């Protein structure tokens, strides 16, 4: 008795799948209100990771380091000291420009 051992091969090459093709959503960080701009209480001024900008007068710091206005007024970016910057809110435009 004669037995045949047949082996069939694929006629199309198998294609591997890529492990790429994903991307995370942007965090939308940065300065939201510029120097001298009018803001109302609760407006977000800066969204940040860590305290690149520190809160000054009439400015609050959220738990994710977001700076926000606590009163209606004008935004002023100031130097806290040699290496640190702070953001303050002044009710009058003259104080914010000085």
Swiss-Prot record:
CC per GO annotation: cytosolic large ribosomal subunit
Keywords from the named record: Ribonucleoprotein, Ribosomal protein
Signal peptide: none
Molecular functions (GO terms): structural constituent of ribosome
Pfam family, one: Ribosomal_L27
PTM statement from Swiss-Prot or TrEMBL: The N-terminus is cleaved by ribosomal processing cysteine protease Prp.
Stated family: Belongs to the bacterial ribosomal protein bL27 family.
Name assigned to this protein: Large ribosomal subunit protein bL27
Organism of provenance: Desulfitobacterium hafniense (strain DSM 10664 / DCB-2)
């Amino acid at each position: 008795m004669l037995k045949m051992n047949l082996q069939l091969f694929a006629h199309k090459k198998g294609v591997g799948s890529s492990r790429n093709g994903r991307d995370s959503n942007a965090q939308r960080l940065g300065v939201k209100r510029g120097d001298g701009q009018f803001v109302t209480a609760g407006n977000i001024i800066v969204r940040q990771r860590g305290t690149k900008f520190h809160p000054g007068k009439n400015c609050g710091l959220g738990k994710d380091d977001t700076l926000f206005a606590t009163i209606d007024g004008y935004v002023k970016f100031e130097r806290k000291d040699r290496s640190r910057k702070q953001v303050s809110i002044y009710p009058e435009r003259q104080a914010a420009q000085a």
